[in-house]
């Protein structure tokens, strides 16, 4: 059955095209520094926002009109698979991602839930045989059901911990079955509302035990996906333990998990943590922990996770700069963890949104590559820190000095002069590259 009859395959037509169902800047076969755009960007569709989201919010019912929503239960799950692979083919997108409950309804028992999963996974596997679209990552939803009201791996209830572990065990098996390149842990309920009734030490210790057991089981079944943690500071809990990349990295180091995990970084989560997207990417990169990206953007005037499709090309440029400096994302990719706005409720809007996001990152890729080729930012940074390449600065960096020697040096100094940071020049230069790359 076809769900998008009126829409053909999305093709690259160039910046002058007026066709809303065409890429203006994303040309998957265009070579950029020895790799195609498709290889650089590794785009993925988020199954939950694209095929299960009804666009409801706390103030109103869902508005989404989806041709597959005439079905229910397992029939709906199967219809979504059909729609998904038609969507993937028409968008020519290389990857997709899902939670367990996105693809199959939760049953009345764990056994029934697993049986539902087995049925849909078998169907997805058949579709993948004839599709170029692969599984970027999968995960399990350990946050929506009321059993997870107090957390999953960080729950105060050992039975919930066991149930969460059983779900992840099944998730790892599903990932192996479908050839997932990564496996994601997002701890939506792994945090607390108040310290007044929380044993933080026990919860953190248990969370680490959970991660170690997950990796042990992945090794047992020979599932070689990259494990990823997705930081978020809050929502739904008041304070989540994986607040941002820095706190997540400290957790991984403290529990000897830093060689097991990397980070799946979401732009909107960076905003909620009070960081720029590029800050989180940069911090992960310089610690060799940048694994994958949830490509979206938040609304700067709102304090919650709006999950908008990315359209800010200044941000996508700086993001792609960090990814290029990282020599790419390895097994990771750019998953559009984004949903159309509540007023964009037609099935056609799903295509428009993904086209906009893919074009925005294609622009970012080309501008970032030009910035790197011309060493625009590298030259700025090297010049700014040049005092550490000579004299006392070189001794500091090489560890050949101490406070005694530094005091002697300081006593010889007259007035210290500082050069201008010239931030306005740098920002204007980036604007120049943004405006001239496609001129």
Swiss-Prot record:
It catalyses: alpha-D-xylose = alpha-D-xylulofuranose. GO terms for cellular component: cytoplasm. It is found in: Cytoplasm. Keywords: Carbohydrate metabolism, Cytoplasm, Isomerase, Magnesium, Metal-binding, Xylose metabolism. One of its GO terms (molecular function) is xylose isomerase activity. Its main location: cytoplasm. The active site is at 99, 102. Mg(2+) 2 binds at residues 266, 269, 305, 307. Transmembrane segments: none annotated. Homotetramer. This is Xylose isomerase. The gene is xylA.
């Amino acid at each position: 059955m076809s769900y998008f009859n009126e829409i053909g395959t999305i093709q690259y037509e160039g910046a002058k095209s007026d066709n809303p169902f065409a890429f203006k800047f994303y040309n998957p076969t265009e070579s950029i520094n020895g790799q195609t755009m498709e290889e650089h960007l590794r785009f993925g569709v988020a199954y939950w926002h694209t095929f299960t989201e009804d666009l409801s919010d706390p103030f109103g019912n869902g508005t989404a009109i989806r041709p597959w929503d005439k079905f229910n239960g397992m029939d709906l799950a199967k219809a979504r698979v059909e729609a998904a692979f038609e969507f993937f083919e028409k968008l020519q997108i290389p990857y997709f991602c899902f939670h367990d409950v996105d693809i199959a309804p939760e049953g009345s028992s764990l056994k029934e839930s697993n049986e539902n999963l087995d049925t849909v996974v078998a169907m997805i596997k058949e579709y993948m045989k004839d599709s170029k679209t692969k599984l970027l990552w999968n995960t399990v939803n350990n946050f929506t059901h009321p059993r997870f009201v107090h957390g999953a791996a960080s729950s105060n209830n050992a039975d919930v911990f066991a149930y969460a572990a059983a779900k992840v065990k099944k998730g790892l098996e599903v990932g192996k079955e479908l050839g997932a390149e990564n496996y994601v842990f997002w701890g939506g309920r792994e945090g607390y509302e108040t310290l007044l009734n929380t044993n933080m030490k026990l919860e953190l210790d248990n969370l680490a035990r959970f991660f170690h057991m997950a990796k042990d089981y992945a090794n047992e079944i020979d599932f070689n996906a990259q494990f990823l943690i997705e930081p978020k500071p809050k929502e739904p809990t008041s304070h989540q333990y994986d607040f941002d990349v820095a706190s997540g990295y400290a957790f991984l180091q403290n529990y000897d998990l830093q060689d097991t995990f990397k980070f799946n970084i979401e732009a909107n989560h960076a905003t909620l943590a009070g960081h720029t997207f590029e800050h989180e990417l940069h911090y992960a990169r310089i610690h060799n922990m940048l694994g994958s990206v949830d490509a979206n953007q938040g609304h700067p005037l709102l304090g919650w996770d709006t999950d908008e499709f990315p359209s800010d090309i200044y941000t996508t440029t700086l993001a792609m700069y960090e990814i290029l400096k990282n020599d790419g994302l390895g097994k990771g990719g750019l998953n559009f963890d984004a949903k159309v706005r509540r007023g964009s409720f037609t099935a056609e809007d799903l295509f428009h949104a993904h086209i906009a996001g893919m074009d925005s990152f294609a622009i970012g890729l080309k501008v970032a590559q030009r910035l790197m080729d011309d060493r625009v930012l590298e030259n700025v940074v090297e010049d700014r820190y040049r005092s550490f390449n000579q004299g006392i600065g070189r001794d500091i960096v090489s560890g050949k000095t101490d406070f005694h020697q530094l005091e002697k040096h300081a006593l010889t100094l007259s007035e210290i002069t500082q050069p201008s940071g010239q931030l306005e020049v740098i920002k204007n230069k980036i604007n120049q590259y943004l405006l001239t790359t496609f001129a």
